[in-house]
Structures are given as structure tokens and as C-alpha cells.
Amino acid sequence: PKMVEKDNHWFGINAWGGSVCVNTDLLRKKGLSVPRSWSDLLQSEFQDQIVMPNPRASSTGLMFLHGFVQGFGEKKGWEVIEKLHANMLFYAASGARPAAMAAQGEIPIGLSAAAFLKPFLKYKTPVSVVQPEEGIAWDAEACALPRGGPHPQEAKAFWDFCAGPAVGQIAADFSGIAA
């Protein structure tokens, strides 16, 4: 996708989104269905079955909160957050941890970025990614060239590096959605 600011002050390197990472074996053992929506995750059957990143410690966690408020509107978004909180086992200190916990069979459901689950998928772990039917929060990682910075030549060299094929490949490998 084209991720460029109209005045060329910044450009996107890649995009990534929040996902529901589920361990299908654990769900089956606990008699739980695979959630298909955020509404599903608010049901009492999922109490203490979900881990998500702490929004105070993780940009991934903050992205989820922002996505709920943006996607559902402020009033309903905060209602979703409060109901989801009631089902939370705990909040992880990193965005990657809930995906890893689901992949390793520690929890049935981890809210994380699908990109964090990629390394586990090649080992045929019983995990899958669910994109809730209401939509997901997403973010773009970007590069900007600051005006009036103390090292303009170095900043421009970094800009050029970020726009190059090496960073593009890293972005594609990480998130699958390179700019």
C-alpha cells in the first residue's frame, strides 16, 4: 500500500494489525468455541482465558484500546474495553507475549499482532489467527525527516536506508504488509 504523507515529511515502512491469536487445542480441551468477533470475547465463557498487552507498557496494547474507541465510537468502545477487562486473565508487559503464550499452550487466547505469531506457525503449533468480524486496529511504522535537526546529513542517510530494499524486506518478513 502507498503510505506517504502528502507533503513528503514521512513515509510508511510497513503496516501491522492487532489480532486474536487462539490455541485451538486449548479451546477444544476447555469446551470453548473459536471466537469470531469482539462480541464473542465479551461473553462470560471466556473469563480468565484471555491475555493482552498492557497499554501502559506496550504500544500494541495501546493500539488495541485506540482501535476499540475508533472502531466502536467512544462510548461503546469504552464499554467493550470494560467488558473485555472482566475476561482478562492478566495484562502482559509486551505486545509479543500474548501470541507466544497462545502458541506455547499457556493460554487459549492472546490479543497480539499477527506478526508476532509468524515464527510459531512454521513449527505447526495448534494456533491460528482470528481477524474479528468487526475489524481490527492497525498501525503503520514510519520514517520521518526532522526539520532543523542537528545532523541533517545523517538523518537523510537514515531516511534513504529506510526507503531502501533491505528495510523493505525486513518489513515484509515481519508484518507481511510492506509499503
Predicted regions and their residues:
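Periplasmic-binding protein-like
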Residues: 46-53, 80-85, 91-92, 123-147, 161-178
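A bilobed periplasmic-binding-protein/Venus flytrap-type ligand-binding module shared by bacterial periplasmic
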Residues: 21-26, 139-152, 170-171
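Ligand-binding "clamshell"
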Residues: 1, 5-7, 119-131
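Extracytoplasmic ligand-binding site segments that recognize negatively charged/polar headgroups
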Residues: 1-106
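Short, hydrophobic alpha-helical packing/hinge segments within bilobed ligand-binding/sensory domains
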Residues: 98-99, 117, 155, 168
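Short secondary-structure boundary segments
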Residues: 24, 54, 114-115, 174-175
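A ligand-binding cleft/hinge motif common to bilobed small-molecule-binding domains
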Residues: 103, 107-126
